[in-house]
């Protein structure tokens, strides 16, 4: 729905970086700038607020919300699927500004109309009650364990520990450039596909699963979401 334009593309570089301010230009007739803060496939992440040239910012924060610092006030719309950091799939958290609420097109389908959902108290259709219940439990758990500051600190400690080990030897080949490495998804390669398969098999035998990279890119990927304890990273590093 709508006329969208991609204003930056790192495909020729293998998606190892994210755009810095000044690397792209925004169409003068654009209504907003949309970006995704964390790339789960390639392990890259924004660590700065992208310049929007005065346009409202719309953010997909599905894979790092409540896991890294986020300036909510700098955005007019933030949406995030809960299935990474907040709870089970089937629940989406949406944060809207008055600007976004006032600009819903009249001909948009009701299921995509945030104003409809807001006016009905998020009960326009039968909600995923179990998913919302689990979401509430996760929020309570985060509050009991240091709140957002605690979650952010734990995630940084986990990723710092793993990146330190990956940088220790040239045998490991981290994918993302250092200035945009993801705190949530650490991705790397080994010298050969055969060694990667051997690493994954031996990791599984040691009780460490879920390390295979996304099917579209391969390699190794460790997802360090809020629910991942630092003990898991310590075991991987050992």
Predicted regions and their residues:
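Active-site C-terminal subdomain of aminotransferase-like
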Residues: 82-164, 177
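Conserved PLP-binding catalytic core of the aspartate aminotransferase-like
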Residues: 172-203
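Conserved active-site segment immediately N-terminal to the catalytic lysine
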Residues: 58, 72-83
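Active-site phosphate-binding strand-loop segment of PLP-dependent enzymes
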Residues: 10-65
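PLP-dependent enzyme catalytic core of the Aspartate aminotransferase-like
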Residues: 214-238
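Membrane helical hairpin/interfacial module
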Residues: 1-3
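A short secondary-structure junction signal
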Residues: 17-19, 43-48, 67-73, 89-92, ...
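A short linear hydrophobic-aromatic micro-motif
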Residues: 171-175, 207-213
């Amino acid at each position: 729905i709508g006329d969208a334009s991609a204003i930056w593309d790192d495909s020729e570089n293998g998606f190892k970086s994210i755009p810095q301010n000044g690397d792209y230009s925004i169409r003068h007739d654009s209504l907003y700038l949309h970006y995704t803060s964390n790339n789960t496939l390639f392990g890259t992440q924004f660590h700065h607020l992208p310049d929007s040239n005065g346009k409202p910012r719309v953010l997909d924060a599905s894979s790092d919300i409540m896991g890294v610092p986020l300036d909510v006030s700098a955005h007019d719309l933030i949406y995030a699927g809960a299935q990474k950091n907040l709870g089970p799939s089937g629940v989406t958290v949406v944060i809207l500004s008055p600007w976004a609420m006032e600009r819903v097109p009249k001909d948009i389908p009701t299921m995509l109309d945030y104003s409809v959902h807001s006016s009905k108290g998020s009960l326009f259709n039968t909600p995923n009650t179990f998913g919302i219940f689990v979401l509430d439990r996760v929020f309570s758990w985060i509050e009991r364990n240091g709140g957002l500051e605690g979650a952010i600190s734990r995630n940084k400690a986990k990723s710092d520990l793993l990146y330190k080990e990956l940088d220790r030897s040239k045998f490991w080949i981290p994918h993302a450039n250092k200035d945009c490495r993801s705190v949530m998804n650490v991705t790397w390669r080994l010298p050969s596909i055969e060694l990667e398969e051997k690493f994954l098999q031996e990791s599984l035998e040691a009780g460490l699963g879920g390390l295979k990279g996304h099917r579209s890119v391969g390699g190794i990927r460790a997802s360090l979401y809020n629910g991942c304890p630092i003990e898991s990273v310590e075991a991987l590093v050992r």
